Amino acid sequence: MAAGAFILGSTGLCGYQMLRFAEKSSLFDKISTVGRKLPDFKSEKVHLIQEADSDKWPEIIEKEAKGYSTFFSGLGSTIGAAGSAENFERIDYGINYAAAKAAKKAGVQTFVLISAPLSNANSRFLYIRTKGKLEDDIIALKFARTIILRPGILLGEREKFRSITESIIVGISKYTHGNFLSALTVPAYGEEMGQIAVNLASEPIPQSQTEPIVNIISAKQITNLAKKL
């Protein structure tokens, strides 16, 4: 039976690929996305909603995702790109959590989140702590199924400027991808992430399931899943 999917962060590295693979999937007959900018994507299945004010997104999500089965979030930033720690938290935690609450109100069953390795709400490091708090609070919403993907370094073309350090790490990762050294950097391509996210969300929730399901997929597990694509 076909269902609907809502995608947040569809202009990003992972979000755009989730949009691509969700559109190809026979599971989803309608896909919606909202953002300040819209992806360069045309399909009769896809409803693109442009809204510059992210404070209005929860209301849009709650209305648009009514009856949808799945919500994908690839929305994320870095402290450098966000411009400040406060703005980073507002984007990575605030917007994502508000969207998750709206998706829950809309009746979404499966929530898929692109997170980060070592996410921990008790960490002393802002990036890891913010990711961990978001994971914990989304799990607490008790979707029928929550899927959290924790990729290592994400590879692929990005419009935004990378720091010199990140560029060096990414350069090394391209040579370790798929070999025995990959455990050191555990890179993942955006295209792989999109396909894996959609594949996992496409698996049926057991009808006998009474408790919320939480699947946390580590960077190593993502690497193993990518080899099977």
UniProtKB/Swiss-Prot annotation:
UniProt keyword terms in alphabetical order: Membrane, Mitochondrion, Mitochondrion outer membrane, Transit peptide
GO biological process: import into nucleus
Compartment(s) of residence: Mitochondrion outer membrane
GO cellular component terms listed in the entry, alphabetical order: mitochondrial outer membrane
Transit peptide stretch: 1-45
Membrane topology designation: Peripheral membrane protein
InterPro entries: Him1/Fmp52, NAD(P)-bd_dom_sf
UniProt xrefs under Pfam families: HIM1
Keyword Membrane: yes
Principal location: mitochondrion
PANTHER family xref list: OXIDOREDUCTASE HTATIP2
Protein family: Belongs to the FMP52 family.
Protein's UniProt name: Protein FMP52-2, mitochondrial
UniProt organism field: Scheffersomyces stipitis (strain ATCC 58785 / CBS 6054 / NBRC 10063 / NRRL Y-11545) (Yeast)
